[in-house]
Amino acid sequence: MAGVFERVKKIIVDQLGVEEDEVTMEASFIDDLGADSLDIVELIMAFEEEFELEIPDEDAEKIRTVGDAVNYIQERV
């Protein structure tokens, strides 16, 4: 799990400009990390590129926390 989490965390830090210690499994992209809807779209695209997978819109809408993203990716890679 650490491998996926670390890669997801790096993308979030790079995209949102937040501190690494703010990125926890429980952190909400919007409420805790200050992302807006465009940021979320860009994060999903970055996850797709990094992990070479496609995240359908209906799945992307369910990814609200860092943990959601990590778990979703782990189930598919």
Curated annotation (Swiss-Prot):
Pfam family, one: PP-binding
Gene3D superfamilies, A to Z: ACP-like
Organism classification: Bacteria, Bacillati, Bacillota, Clostridia, Thermoanaerobacterales
Protein name: Acyl carrier protein
Description of post-translational modifications: 4'-phosphopantetheine is transferred from CoA to a specific serine of apo-ACP by AcpS. This modification is essential for activity because fatty acids are bound in thioester linkage to the sulfhydryl of the prosthetic group.
Keywords: Cytoplasm, Fatty acid biosynthesis, Fatty acid metabolism, Lipid biosynthesis, Lipid metabolism, Phosphopantetheine, Phosphoprotein
Record GO terms (molecular function): acyl binding; acyl carrier activity
Residue numbers bearing the O-(pantetheine 4'-phosphoryl)serine modification: S37
Name of the gene: acpP
